[in-house]
């Protein structure tokens, strides 16, 4: 298994859990570039149809559904990504707009805090995509 981390400007990085030891320096492998001028705010893991997914909320690129089945064998990105995104694929979730916070509610739903264009906040339970 891997620990997955998302960082500003937005690499997705895997760290093999077996390599994590107390006090040791951790080196990860960048497996995706999810777009510049962006920051992930929340990331949840869920299972749907027998497959595992990440659902990632971002400041500038909306919510992304990322299948995890290719993570273990995904090659590291070691050169500049010359397109908007690169590495493991993802699917934008167009139905989730203005998401500021995201968490797993149960095995069928997420709970999201959204902000409308006028600034109003809503707390919603939504089906996992």
Give, region by region, the residue ranges found by the protein language model.
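Sequence/structural signature of beta-propeller domains
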Residues: 1-129
